[in-house]
Curated annotation (Swiss-Prot):
Keywords: Cell membrane, Membrane, Transmembrane, Transmembrane helix. This is Uncharacterized protein AF_1016. The chain crosses the membrane at residues 26-48, 97-119, 132-150. It is found in: Cell membrane. Its main location: membrane.
Amino acid sequence: MGGIMDARRLEDEVEMPLEGIVYGEVSGWLTIIGILVAIAGIIIGVVTGNSVFDYQSTIKDLLSGHDEEKIWTDDSIFHSEPHGYWFLNVIHTGDGIAMFGIALAVYGGIVGLLLLIVFTFRSREVLLYKKGLYTFLAIAIFCLMVYCAWEAEF
């Protein structure tokens, strides 16, 4: 029992850095909201039939081992494999809403990291911690994440 009390006392004494709190809260909540939007989109697509895919054909083709290009060509309203942010053109469908939710969850990390960097610049001590290595790494990771998002092909 003493170990639990010591851990709680230590937890009360440790002050979390504001940068970490901002990153955790923003990325965490955007991820949760994105997941809920994606689940709502799936439910809308299945219940109403307002979908990009013919679900019965898609499941049959998946179980038959067809590749993604054939499934997109045969089972979707596009009749070809879409690229980029295709879901924005069909946001009125269940699949469009679901994919938007997934994108929102992914971009939660990018927005959280951007705010972490902004809050890092508020304090010289935090900015130059470990000779600025952490700040440099945060900026490098942010640039990589933005590049990957920019070049995304869903």
